[in-house]
Amino acid sequence: MNYCSSCLNVDTRPNSNFPKKNLCSACDYYFKTKNVNYEERIIILNNIVKKFPKNPKRRYDCIIGVSGGKDSTRQALWIRDKLNLRPLLVCLGYPPEKSNNIGPHNLSNLINLGFDVHCIYYSPKQWKDLARYCFRNFGNYLRHSEQAIVSAVPRLAIKYKIPVIFWGENPGDVLGDSKTQGKTGYDGNNVKF
């Protein structure tokens, strides 16, 4: 068993790895981003946003995939209030087996804050059929819901002609799960089926 030299996390945690100098991937990410010039990144982000001027014929300027977690609320507020964009929020409604009361409460809060939230739900039968299929074929009965949110956001962006998509953080970098890491961050490279 190996330990992270910074946080003492162990390599026996599922999907963990220690890419550099006995650091877990979460600590490695922390040290990589410690000296990031966020003021420069804000300028870059603002320049990207300027490439997609507001269009009065379009109801939304951007789209954000949200889960109902605290990060979703922060991200939506920041994009609306700091970047002055009109976002459409997209959420995959999870079945009772995978949700608690906090997510729906936070989504209600987003609606009360003036956001439009597009929720996508499976029928109970469809959810069970997909869960069974994913368990048998991938060993992960929730894989269908993980892939659904990654595909739903771009599909709705195309459908409603929304030019900008905002994604949240990469859980592999932030939480240390190497199975979710893509080539350039959380870019969908692990979505294979």
Region spans (language model):
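ATP-dependent adenylation/nucleotidyltransferase module used to activate substrates
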Residues: 2-193
